Amino acid sequence: MAQQQQQQLQQQQQHHTSSINNNNSILLLHQQQPQQQQQQQLDQLQQYNNNLYSQNYNMEEYERRKRREREKIERQQGIQIDDRETSLFGEPRRLTEGDAEITAALGEFFEARVYINNQTVGISRSAPGAGNPRLQPNLPPQAKSLGHSPSSASSAAGPTSASATTALPGQQQHYQQQQRPPTYVKQADNKPPYNGRGGYPGQPMKNDIPSSSGMAPPRGPPRSSSSNSNSSSATNNASSGGVPANTPLGPPLSTQMPNGREKSFLGPPAPALHNGTGGGRFVPPAASKRPGVGQQPPPPEKDVNKIISDIANIFSVQPLTSIAATPHAPTRENYNLLAPNKQKYAMDIPSSPPSAEPSSLMTPLFTPIAPLVTTPPQASQLPLGAATSGTILAGEPLAPLHQLPPTPPKAASGVTSPGPTKPLKTEKNHSLEKQDSCLENDLELSESEDEQRKKEGRSAGNSSNSSESDSSESGSESSSKNDLQHHPNHQQHHHQLQQQQQASMQQQQVLQQQQQHRPQPLTSNGAQNKKFRHEIIARGSNTITGLLSSSGFGSGGSVGPAGVNSSAVMGAGSVSGGTLSSGGSSSNKTPSPTESNKWNLSRFFHKPANQTNSESVSPGNVSMKVPGILPGGAQIIPESIDVTTAIVKNEKIHDDHMAMEEGEEEDDDEEQQMRYGGGLSVTPVAVKKEAIDAVSEMALGAIPKTQIKRESAEALLSARLSDSGTSASGSSSSSSSSSDSAVGGEVVPMPGPGETFQLPGVPADITTVVRVPPTQSQKAPPSNSVTLTPILPLPTSPKQRQKKPRKKKAVTSAPILDSSDDDEPPPKHPGLDHSAVSVQAQPATDTVKKGRGRPRKQQQSGGSGNLSSASAGSSSQTKGPTLTAAKKPLAKTPLAMSRARKREHSSQSSSNGNTPTKKVATPVLVAAPLKPTSVTAGSSSSDEDSSSSAESSSKSSSSSSSSDDTETQNTNCRIVKLNKTGAVQKKALLGSGSSSASSSGSEPEDQTSRSQVGSGQALAQQLPPYKQLPISQHSQHLSSSECSSSSGGCTAVCSSSSGEEDEGRREKERERKPKSDKNKISTLTRIFNPKEGGAKKQGQVVIVDLQEEQQQGKLDAAAQPPPPHAPPAAPAAIMAKPRMTPTQQQQLGAGLASPARTTTPHLTSLICKIDLSKLSRERIMRLKKLTPAQQNGHLTPKDQATNAVHVPNGYAGDTNPAAKVKHEHPVKPEPELDAGYEAKFKPGNVKQEFQLKQERDRDRERERERERERERDREREQPPGRRRKRSSSSSSSPYKEKKRKKEKADQLQIGKELLPVPVLLPSNNHERMPNHDRLSYDKLQLLHEDAAAVIGDVSAANGSPTKKLLVMSPLPPPPTVTVAPATCNEAVQTTPPSATTTTATAPPVPATRLIYRSYFDRDVEHPSDDLRKNNQFLQEAINRKHAADLERDSFNQVTLYLEAVVYFLLTADAMERCSSEQATNTMYKDTLSLIKFISTKFRPYQQQSTTNIQHETHNKVAILSLRCQSLISLKLYKLRRKDCRAIINGLTDFFRVGRGDIANGNTPSSISPSNSVGSQGSGSNTPPGRIVSPDIHNMLCKQNEFLSYLNSAHELWDQADRLVRTGNHIDFIRELDHENGPLTLHSTMHEVFRYVQAGLKTLRDAVSHPTHQSQ
């Protein structure tokens, strides 16, 4: 052994990097023995054996000899470890459960198997950070070590535990392996493809050769190792030292550590990989693959021995602590046969900075923190990671984490230097790859075949991807998605091991696990929520921030971990927002149900195309359509889409969205916990656990106590809101606010609507996003406080949390709330839970409000105050289920029964609307709570889901997609709520309206909006005292009806109302009182009654069947407004809600009808087209004024837009009173609808919009004549009610009128000013701007808001001022993108200009408003003449070109080539000024040749159907390529234009003069007289011709060349245009045009560069998060 170790030491010295990394991994694995393993003797080996490495160490002599022989042969042959990587194990080593060595190293396999079977069955990857090596092949070879670092991060718990206990790392590693082991067991038995096991592809026989066999590598570990290391190198550079050891890939430090060959591979392979990488930035996929194969668990025997000996030898040099982080790598490899090699590979990637994202994903619950600390890429996470790592771990895990961070530095110092050369690169890739494969496989429900295929495909594809971009690029992101999802499970398992090893940790996390275990079964049951979770994870993984946002509770980097911790006690998530989430969730998800869920979720995660991004979210972040629901809302998009379908049927909407969430409340909540567990793992635990507060505090250790408290209470709501996946932050905020009040969470003071409140350890951006003024609103008193919890994108997971906390909190906060709240918690609808919490929170804020609110809810029949409070409570609960829930309490059904019934009611909610009407008191509560929920939770529970996801997306860059989807869902929720409200409208409306008004009255700020939600009940009680109540009710109506759908809108209303609240409320009251119940009833009836105006196909408003009943109920409520103030509020609410529903439905119908996704068909209820014409234009304008003012200007409209988006028709006004007063909102949602609902009203669909608009215009023109008369009468009789119709809040319309009259000019000015200053816009735009003047401004603002619609919705709900400010901040950029929606809104708002335009579809105005840069207004690019900079461009181009040459994944290769092309273009552009014309011409020609070569890569895909996502992405790349070719050809022509002119002039003269001899048989040739004899015979046969001089011939040739360039430029451009149309990629191009300015034949090379880079980034995000893309 000693000799062996020495030999290995020598080998390691040769490949010191790999060796050191391996040693570090081993040492880390054996952290228990902190002593430097200078002893190279069996003692150390035994120690390693005792630890996870004992198995490797206790290799039989036969195995050792074989390994030595292998190493000898490799050394002789110069075979690098890379080659040996081919085979994971020198020989397919079978690890029997009774294997003594394995037992010694990993502990009893039975125990491990218990974890694997029970907790990690679906999870093959144990290293969350390690797992997407193929995503990270792009990263430099060093990345391997870093890639390993993420693996270490995932195994961070191991290192941490190692520090604390040697057993812990072993167990952790075992745990991680358990995740893979189940797969390993299966695949070991069933299929070799598992990627590593025996040496299927690369048996002991020369790992080199088998390494490339692709068995495991195809999966991605081998390529991953190389790629992964690159991608994570940056991240792991810091953590490589500690992390690599700590990575699950203990042996994999050398990538193939597990195999006997791996050890030797450590030395040479890394260099080989590095060389193959060609500079290390882009590791060749093949090289990575080989390591991956070699690193597969099967080879651990020899590799382990080698590693052990190397560790003994090398470790003596390096402190044990450095190696301590590697403890569980061997075990992981041994057990995770399917993708253990990935972990191995990942394990050794100490210096893989690019794995910032992968690291997050890979980091285990505990280990992630260390990677955070060590990984620079996760800078945002790092602060939290370091500070929060302990906290996040919920205490005990924290200690190991803290230990781990110190260890990574050592590892970084000792291991990082050597590691980067080879192990870093290889191992990092492996770890990432492993994660990816494991994640994918696990998500695939451990279907070995699918796993193998996915792993192979993924290893090939992802490793390529990873080479393309560091950890966050397309491959890496895609991998990250999986990693996130997988890692949650993996982390869970790992975390569980740690917990078992560490008593206290065990207890805390066991509880979490138990809590999560409960949800996990549900998770498997609820596929929808899983989808959300996966989507969120996918979105989050796009970027670290996105990861944090989507996964981490506090998502934005530092906040992400804190938030995650709050949500989930597990701190591992802290490292990577996603990872933490997944870590926290992992405890919950660890149960077998979770695994199955994860598997399913993984599929859903990948299958649902598109982020967002934005994605990333990735809000996202995704993708990076910031506002798009798909990118940001991608998390929710699956549900959103479902919800959309549900929206079609109000009943179904309630059911699908609400029922999904309520009906599946437990399942969904748990599911979402499980699902988002990957991202929100921690949060779900806290939420799920009744001891959430304690857990939250532990998890939120890094977060301020206030935040933690809030998170605990808020986490429940926030979790649910987050769970919806829509702007987790916004939704979370909303939830948080309620939770805060209810749970007693502290509220952090908020500077102001435009300001960013600062939370300790929380990034400003997150804080801004959170913008929890609405949350504070719930907590009416602290209007300037913000709840930190909302920051979570994790909230997806929090759903579960919310559910349980809701029950707890609801019961605890207010027994009164118990009946409704408990019922609601059972529904587990995020919205409901949130509502319940909201109400509770309000009571917390206002004990009287809450206690009275809920009880009054029960006492609803009581006075208006009771109704109002009940309404507020109901508002909180108001998701479709809320209504049911409210009824349930009346029915006195048990909570369990309530849940079941609620689920049933969710589906029946539409029809049940009548029941609420009958039980007006309870329904009122439901109805009112509905609004509060939306305000508090950003949306209702179902809305919340879509809203949160959409919002995060909105934050990213796919605002339109996200927003659309969110809005659709919101609309669904809204419609359902409205319907329910309608049914319960008598008192529900009163309660909701009055409570809203009260809330507004008590809190003028946006927070009042929340207050209205939560304290709306109390306000309802206060209703009589507050005359502001009308306005407040207006806000509340927005909150209840619209806020459910669009929490942002409600918040905005409140915020807006704050300044104008008194005035608005007074006007509202005046309006409401003047409005007779008759008018309201008639209006509502017209809107909702198919027999009346509503169903005359005027507005295409889809009305649920229940709506009629609800209308009646609303009418009844309007007719029976008990309190003096409440009656007006109730009528306003009634009208608003019914109106809102029609408007929303209209927009849904219109927005969805035009696109393929038409909610109308789904809607079982009538399709009623409501015309804004019904509402007087003046009123609309007034409503705009008032609504925006009360709703924080356009921000609220934007939030409302999400809800009102579906109500583009004139009824936006009517509906808006309850749902959303702002017409802008109806328009805003259109962009969101555009993304979510195929952008019916989006500018992209201008034609559709115009057609719809024309149709609606014709219908509405006819209807408007009638409606105008009616509305005029109503205005005279009931100005407030109708205004309410106009605006979300009925009381806002009078105020708007005043504002319009007083500040018409001011508002225009302010609007203009506000546009630049988005933050100001929300509060003042609508208030100050006159209707028409403000319409234009509103359009722009709406466009901005649309872009930030998702954020706005969530934000508005969470904190109207802050969120709106945040939303508005994005607004200025989005205008171009969201112009169409804004236009639609504007059209709606500009009802006076054209009745038709008043409907949601008002493209004409927006069309004129579409903002494009003028050709003469272009920013003049003054490229630097600095040669150094030009050389930098050239170097970047060359690097990408070489990386693309080595890339194996077709998409990654093509994108890398295209990136190289644009860099070459920048170089050529610079050469135009610095170099000769010929050199420049040559550069362009060469570039054109290169891009033509690239185009050959697209052809196979272009000719195939574009239904395939891969083909679509290739087609989009082809479009960008054709554009580049066209512009290059044009540039080549322009460069020679002077020559061309001279040639043309010369040729013109030549042809004009007719010079030239006629050559024919009769004329001897003067040129060749000697040939005359020979030519005489045939001369007569030659046709007459003209003899031209050589000069003329040359000129003709040159002219042909130059003009061919010109012709090609136009031809290629036309080809691109055709491909855009035939491939249906218009939205993609339009989005790029809006974001980067249109690409034209006049574009400069710098503009081409920006445009193409943006397009490639979007495509990578889409590939990383296919769910976003698909949607």
From Swiss-Prot:
Pfam families attached to this UniProt entry: AFF4_CHD
A single GO cellular-component term on record: nucleus
Domain of life, source organism: Eukaryota
Cellular compartment(s): Nucleus
MF terms in GO: DNA binding; RNA polymerase II-specific DNA-binding transcription factor binding; transcription coregulator activity
Main localization of the protein described in the UniProt heading: nucleus
Region (Disordered), start-end ranges: 53-79, 126-304, 393-599, 723-761, 774-1162, 1185-1311, 1562-1586
Any single GO BP term: wing disc dorsal/ventral pattern formation
Extent of Acidic residues compositional bias: 439-450
DNA-binding residues (ranges): 849-861
Sequence ranges of Basic and acidic residues compositional bias: 70-79, 424-437, 1063-1080, 1224-1241, 1250-1280
UniProt modified residues of type Phosphothreonine: 416, 1362
Sequence ranges of Basic residues compositional bias: 487-496, 800-810
Sequence ranges of Polar residues compositional bias: 588-599, 774-786, 907-917, 1009-1020, 1188-1203
Bias kind Low complexity: ranges: 145-179, 210-242, 459-479, 497-522, 561-587, 723-755, 858-896, 947-963, 988-1002, 1032-1058, 1562-1581
PANTHER family per UniProt: AF4/FMR2 FAMILY MEMBER, AF4_FMR2 FAMILY MEMBER LILLI
Protein family: Belongs to the AF4 family.
The protein's name: AF4/FMR2 family member lilli
